C-alpha cells in the first residue's frame, strides 16, 4: 500500500454557490463514507475556519450554544478533488450513505439533528430532531431504515427513510457506535459510559 494523493480540506465556498462567503475556508475532517459505487468519498468537518466562522463548536454543547454550522465535503475519487459541499449542522460527526445511493445522512452533534441530503437533488431535504448528541448511524441493506445513536441519552432512533418518521429503542446510557450484522438481523451498539 502506498500514498496516492493528499486532498487539502480547504474550499472556496462561494464557488459552490454559498455567496455570503469569500476566499478559501479550511475544514476539520472527522469521519468519512464512500458512495455505494465507489466514485465519491464524503467527509464531515467538525468546524470550518475562515471569515464568517467565529464560534467553533465543542463536544459540550446544545443548539442554544450558538456555535457555527459546518459543511459536508465530497471528494471525486477520479481526480482527488473536492467537487461538492453541503451545509449541515453544528459539529457534524458521522456520515453514512444509504445503499441505494438516495440519501446521505449526517449526525450533527451540537444541533441535536440528522441532516438528510438527497443525492439526486444535491441538497439537504430534511433535518430530523434526535436529542442530545446524535452519533453513530447505520442503514439497513434495503435502505428502508436508518438507526441513529443518541449518545447523550439512552435510546436508538429508528428512522423510516420513506416517511422520516421515528420510533425508539431503549438501550441504556450513552450509545455511541452502531454496527449491523451482515444479514441485518442484529444491531450492535457500543455504550460509552456503561
List PLM regions with ranges.
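Predominantly soluble domains enriched in secretory-pathway, periplasmic, or organellar proteins
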Residues: 1-194
